[in-house]
C-alpha cells in the first residue's frame, strides 16, 4: 500500500486519471494490481 494509492478497482490506467485528479489534483496515475496508483 502507498500514500498515493486509491482503494479503487481498475482495469486500465486511464480509469485512474479522473479519481487521481479528484484526490490529488493531478490526472496522472496507473493501474497496478487492479488498484489505482496516482502520481503527484
UniProtKB/Swiss-Prot annotation:
Belongs to the short scorpion toxin superfamily. Potassium channel inhibitor family. Alpha-KTx 12 subfamily. Transmembrane segments: none annotated. The lineage of its organism: Eukaryota, Metazoa, Ecdysozoa, Arthropoda, Chelicerata. Disulfide bonds join 2-5, 10-31, 16-36, 20-38. The keyword Secreted applies. This is Potassium channel toxin alpha-KTx 12.3. It comes from the Eukaryota. One of its GO terms (cellular component) is extracellular region. Its main location: secreted. It is found in: Secreted. Signal peptide: none annotated. The keyword Nucleus does not apply. Expressed by the venom gland. Inhibits high conductance calcium-activated potassium channels (KCNMA). Inhibits Shaker B potassium channels. GO terms for molecular function: ion channel inhibitor activity; potassium channel regulator activity; toxin activity. Has the structural arrangement of an alpha-helix connected to antiparallel beta-sheets by disulfide bonds (CS-alpha/beta). The record marks 39 as: Aromatic residue of the functional dyad.
Amino acid at each position: 500500500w502507498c500514500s498515493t494509492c486509491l482503494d479503487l478497482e481498475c482495469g486500465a490506467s486511464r480509469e485512474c486519471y479522473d479519481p487521481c485528479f479528484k484526490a490529488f489534483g493531478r490526472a496522472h496515475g496507473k493501474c497496478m494490481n487492479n488498484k489505482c496508483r496516482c502520481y503527484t
